Amino acid sequence: MNKEEMNARQKKIRNFSIIAHIDHGKSTLADRILEQTGALTHREMKNQLLDSMDLERERGITIKLNAVQLKYKAKDGETYIFHLIDTPGHVDFTYEVSRSLAACEGAILVVDAAQGIEAQTLANVYLALDNDLEILPVINKIDLPAADPERVRAEIEDVIGLDASDTVLASAKSGIGIEDILEQIVEKVPEPSGDVDKPLKALIFDSVFDAYRGVIANIRIMDGVVKAGDRIKMMSNGKEFEVTEVGVFSPKATPRDELLVGDVGYLTAAIKNVGDTRVGDTITLANNPAEEALDGYRKLNPMVYCGLYPIDSSKYNDLRDALEKLELNDSALQFEAETSQALGFGFRCGFLGLLHMEIIQERIEREFNIDLITTAPSVIYHVNLTDGSNIVVDNPADMPEPGVIESVEEPYVKATVMVPNDYVGAVMELAQNKRGNFITMEYLDDIRVSIVYEIPLSEIVYDFFDQLKSSTKGYASFDYELIGYKASKLVKMDILLNAEKVDALSFIVHRDFAYERGKIIVEKLKELIPRQQFEVPIQAAIATKIVSRSTIKALRKNVLAKCYGGDVSRKRKLLEKQKEGKKRMKQIGSVEVPQEAFMAILKMDESK
């Protein structure tokens, strides 16, 4: 292909993604676009085609990214090449969304005609604007009885500030307006810029592990050209590989001779480790490297940690294998082995956020058949010690003694909640209970309000989302971003059973809430731990100070049953003997903590 043909081809390429809040119809719209452009026959079509994981279909969310190449014959008679890059919509995967948007020139913004703009719609629009994308608003689900397209159109103009005069009104389910969307993509989305003669620059926006071919990297070519046999280099770590195959997804993987500027496709190069193809990294040629990498790459660090332990300790090695397999596809997942006196052998795992954590746990239980005990999620604390050094703590059990701590800093997030104005009071009360600082509040229209708070991440990782949904009858939508660390009065609370610490039950809490939380946990454990032959004290302690205590009464055999009448000294002798036995038992007896006790503490609503 000569230079002119390449330039002509480049002018016909349109790269775009679809952004939307959960349940606004993103995957359905992608299905209709695939059908309309003839990528699939009606027979091959199944709903949510790009969401290939069962879990994605069930939860109705997109977790992994997918990219497809489509051909579309427009009304002007020309055939255009579309690359549709599917994005996850959830806040935990914000970085992945931003990288897949960086691979596009345009974005279709899908807004539900009944619900209007939600918190994550806004978050994703700002990401798209950061990447200078052309945004095409689409109001979806116009055939719903509750649809109010005019109100939503006004919201798009007022809240986001986009011109909504030529917004497409569509219904992905019924196939209304799909043609108009495709024509708008042709007219409004800019062609890819980039020069085929420059050294290769390709952005990795996702990677998956294949047992036979190694890592398959999804890439967008920004400059240059790549073909099988090229030696490539990763710009973040300098590692080199030889390309074995390049191709595109249409929607099945189809090998090609080469990928040119503007193309979105895949590349395999016998790469063994997903960690070598990090999302956002730049690929270049080893013998003719680009001078600088594409911007925006950063290493993903976990935000939330928790311990995963197999209920059946013989499955420890199976759990390690499961985590290693999941890590192949998910470079953000981190884990290391740890042991707990209470739970045995397991792993300390780091996740991007709560949804990420839930999905990994669910996949281990479902795909690998391992039943898990999970400890309470915790965040990463920065601890400044009295000797001037700093340490990072991600496990409450590792928190040093209070005497050597100068101060503790915890991560804060900026949380944006969108809610109907009837529930503003409930949301503000919840945020105050979670130690939130009020930042701002604005009315989006006469019904909806956007409220912004700064809240410690540790308060959100428990059950903030569940409580938010229940206090607003499910109407609130919520989005958060990390803003940095702030000093707080935090203390470590230990739970003692029969005067012994149970390491898996330790947690870090704000000093002002320590007494209430200690009291709740102690009462809860008293209900759940079965009675023993001896008295068991349960205590909640901060360092050496006990803040709450409860006692599980002993089970007692009636040793006097065999004395019919008889002398009182005989009875006393039997009672004394029983008392001695109980005392000895208490010294050597250990208390088994049932699985339910750990679960109850995790699920407990601690702010009450």
Curated annotation (Swiss-Prot):
Keywords: Cell membrane, GTP-binding, Hydrolase, Membrane, Nucleotide-binding, Protein biosynthesis. It catalyses: GTP + H2O = GDP + phosphate + H(+). Required for accurate and efficient protein synthesis under certain stress conditions. May act as a fidelity factor of the translation reaction, by catalyzing a one-codon backward translocation of tRNAs on improperly translocated ribosomes. Back-translocation proceeds from a post-translocation (POST) complex to a pre-translocation (PRE) complex, thus giving elongation factor G a second chance to translocate the tRNAs correctly. Binds to ribosomes in a GTP-dependent manner. Its main location: membrane. The gene is lepA. SMART domains: EFG_C. It is found in: Cell membrane. GTP binds at D23, H24, G25, K26, S27, T28, N140, K141, I142, D143. It holds the Pfam family LepA_C. The keyword Cell membrane applies. The keyword Cytoplasm does not apply. GO terms for cellular component: plasma membrane. InterPro entries: EF-4, EFG_III/V, EFG_V-like, EFTu-like_2, G_TR_CS, LepA_C_sf, LepA_CTD, LepA_IV. Its EC number is 3.6.5.n1. GO terms for biological process: positive regulation of translation. It comes from Listeria innocua serovar 6a (strain ATCC BAA-680 / CLIP 11262). This is Elongation factor 4. It is a peripheral membrane protein. Belongs to the TRAFAC class translation factor GTPase superfamily. Classic translation factor GTPase family. LepA subfamily. Residues 11-193 form the tr-type G domain. SUPFAM superfamilies: EF-G C-terminal domain-like (SSF54980), P-loop containing nucleoside triphosphate hydrolases (SSF52540). GO terms for molecular function: GTP binding; GTPase activity; ribosome binding; translation elongation factor activity.
